[in-house]
Amino acid sequence: MVDSLWFVLALVLLAVVSVALVLVLVLRREEAHCGRETRTEYLQPNYGQTGGFRVSSAPSNETIIPYRYWLIEGQVSEIDYDIVPGRRMSLRTAKQGQMLYPTDFFEFAFEDVQQYDIDGITVTQRQNAGRISSIFWVRDGYEYLLYSMQPEMNMIAGLAVPFVTNTRVEPAV
């Protein structure tokens, strides 16, 4: 009688642990897709060991000031910029087909979408008045996304040329 009681208790405990394990796995999978990004901060934009690439050149001067370097989900780099006077932008780079867009990037339909060439590169510019604006381009197997969540009027268009012509990503060696 005592042996069967222990057997039943062991089965109940096993069932509870199994249900808890399934719930943890399901919740963890949902958490990974809820918009939260795993970010690792770097001192410079060289993501060679983890991401397999480095940002070899990007704009940096008295009005375009990089201040933080990230690797997102081990595959997308992001450089945060202060744009004088008092604005912020971010530049994301990734191997072609691996770009991760910021949370809420496509939440609103873009009011204006244009394509144009800069230095032989096709650039897609998207913007909403007073909300998000971005430019996207592809060069040598890498994708580039320059965006601002709170842009100033025509800021993205004014910064497109220096970013498209001066930003390069290359494989890490």
Please annotate each region the language model reported.
Residues L21-R29:
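Juxtamembrane cytosolic interface motif at the C-terminal end of transmembrane helices
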Residues D140-V173:
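Surface-exposed amphipathic alpha-helical segments
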Residues L11-L21:
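Core hydrophobic alpha-helical transmembrane segments of single-pass membrane proteins
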